[in-house]
Amino acid sequence: MLSIAEVSTKAYVGSKVSIRGWVYRIRSSGGVTFVVVRDSSGIIQCTARKNELPEDVYDTISSLGIESSVEFHGTLKEDRRSPSGYEIAVDSFRVYQKNDVFPITKDQGEEFLLDNRHLWLRSREFTSVLKIRSTIFRSFADFFYENGYYQVQTPFMVSTAVEGGSTLFKVDFFGEPIYLNQSAQFYLETMIYSLEKVFTIAPSFRAEKSRTRRHLTEYWHAEAEVAWIDNNEMMDIEERMIYYIVSRVTEDNEDELKMLNRDPEVLKAMKPPFPRIRYSEIIKVANSIGLPLKYGDDLGADEERQITMKYDRPIFVTNYPKDLKPFYMPVDPENPGEVLNHDMLAPEGYGEIIGGSQRIWNYDELMQRIREANLDESAYYWYVDLRKYGSVPHSGFGLGLDRLAMWIMHLDNIREAIPYPRTIRRTKP
């Protein structure tokens, strides 16, 4: 059986067609019932006329509730008044399940919709979100496959923290404490010595008690590690990747973007190269718009929001102070107080979507930084081992796919960008 989008063409006008889906809207007037049916591909109006159908059939159709699952058969006609420009003149139908009252109506509050996310996913708006997310995830993988990378898998349960332990979820593992992973980075680094270029897509977990519009406690993390490249080359790859993903979304999901009131032309204009601005310069930018930041202050969500309102495409902020970043980032030889790293900030107030850096590949430097950070050396023995046996320069990054989706779709809150958001106050449905 064809989808609604496949049926809704001039080629089928005058032909007998069949569609399956769910009742999106229904109304009756003067012995005619208009049923708008939806499936994942679109909507179409099915018209049932009382004088053309058995009385019991017409009565059943006219009493269908929203989200009833149905199958309609009839002749396809053109009709400019119908939502899609086509309608099916119904001659028979089947009800899979008839609903009375669907719980979700037009004017429901945000918390109600979150409590009933399992039903709200059916809305045309959220169907658009899901389609765009699918394109984003697929495009990320396609970009790296097309450039000779290997997709790999890493553990979710770990004993060693990538960036310290204050925001880790602790789990009892047969009497031993372990943690839910925040990043696959360390494990990806082990694999560059066999595959050189690797990536992964997996959930990450952060026990941050944050209530901002862009934070989740469980989020989808896309990460890559690459042998033989430096920080600047890593940024080259990332800006090409972002442009590739955005281009695929504008090509494949123009209708979905418009459904969400996102202008595809705005996204099409965001072509690389993206500006690369040193942290010391971004502090000056912040000061110029009235933000009282000084050198050594980290950029928070609000600062990033205000700074990125100045830009019409993503920017890189590079060379952060050493004290603000994790131990595995090497110092800049020309500026020993700074590290060879970068954050990519999305424009239009969305802020950080990528964090990346060159990685320390020298054994002595790594050991010194571990000790400076007062970390347990024994917990990192296997990570340190990588610097003993054929170590090479390498770089990597982590991309928050939900944040990327939020920006691409121009959504107000990250909870709108993921099917089932997990926050400090929400673990269901």
From Swiss-Prot:
Keywords: Aminoacyl-tRNA synthetase, ATP-binding, Cytoplasm, Ligase, Nucleotide-binding, Protein biosynthesis. It is an enzyme of class 6 (ligase). It catalyses: tRNA(Asn) + L-asparagine + ATP = L-asparaginyl-tRNA(Asn) + AMP + diphosphate + H(+). InterPro entries: Aa-tRNA-synt_II, aa-tRNA-synth_II, aa-tRNA-synth_II/BPL/LPL, Asn-tRNA-ligase, Asp/Asn-tRNA-synth_IIb, NA-bd_OB-fold, NA-bd_OB_tRNA. GO terms for cellular component: cytoplasm. It is found in: Cytoplasm. It holds the Pfam family tRNA_anti-codon. Belongs to the class-II aminoacyl-tRNA synthetase family. This is Asparagine--tRNA ligase. The lineage of its organism: Archaea, Methanobacteriati, Thermoplasmatota, Thermoplasmata, Thermoplasmatales.
